[in-house]
């Protein structure tokens, strides 16, 4: 082989390497997911009470006594005093809450209660779900928990089509419950303020709608079955803030730091399930101003400014839970 031919081959090899590196970076989500986190075809063994044991290490044993959803009897028959105001308690919102609990439900469906071992996945809204092809894997879990207005229709290949529980608050309720949920999906309200109770009451009772008191106008028409609506116990917001983020529970009114719905959903799953996996969690590096943060819309980290969420601190909390084995990740983190 001549020296000239040798250099041509080297140049061709170099071009191929550059193309491969460029392609892997341009398809970062799929590349990392495939290369570092292969999904086993076999179900991971599920051990009853395992998530609860892990949760007690983080949150303490007191959390075991708490109901997942708020119940009418605790506010109607027995006046349960709450130490904190929303979103960490119900102090000052009891009258509104009573009216909401009278028209909603609190039970955990028999299809979940009867499971010998509850295998759950919390599906985040992160960009890294795009092109992940995890839809089939996600659909195999007993309980699939989704967040806010994250769409399913059109993204089934990456995020699945099954939705057991969807956490939301009024400003994030801009989704069609008939299209993005299943008929038996539980719609779980995360209340941040008293007006959130007022909004859900007007929607479910078809009363005069409220338009003020929200940072974004919530839906005025929302076609849902009241018996599919639940009110999340704010205790879980409290322990997520306290035990995972070390946030002060009593904060000045102008400084309202709080966990994201995603971190709250993981906290909920650790108390409801026996095995907890997560997918689609994590944000781009703070220096990356152009990377979109969701799999379904073109918004960047800039949109998080003023949200009251500390995503860097949450990343540390999730990494801690991953390292101790409390949760496992289906996507890279």
From Swiss-Prot:
Cellular component GO terms, alphabetical: Golgi cisterna membrane
Chief site of localization: Golgi
Protein name: CMP-N-acetylneuraminate-beta-galactosamide-alpha-2,3-sialyltransferase 4
Entry keywords, A to Z: Disulfide bond, Glycoprotein, Glycosyltransferase, Golgi apparatus, Lipid metabolism, Membrane, Signal-anchor, Transferase, Transmembrane, Transmembrane helix
Organism: Mus musculus
Pathway noted in the entry: Protein modification; protein glycosylation
Keyword Isomerase assigned: no
PANTHER family: CMP-N-ACETYLNEURAMINATE-BETA-GALACTOSAMIDE-ALPHA-2,3-SIALYLTRANSFERASE 4, SIALYLTRANSFERASE
Gene that this polypeptide is encoded by: St3gal4
pH-dependence of activity, as noted: Optimum pH is 6.4.
Topology term for the membrane: Single-pass type II membrane protein
GO biological process: cognition; glycolipid biosynthetic process; lipid glycosylation; oligosaccharide biosynthetic process; positive regulation of blood coagulation; positive regulation of leukocyte tethering or rolling; protein glycosylation; sialylation
Lineage per the UniProt record: Eukaryota, Metazoa, Chordata, Craniata, Vertebrata
Regions annotated as coiled coil: none
EC number: 2.4.3.2, 2.4.3.4, 2.4.3.6
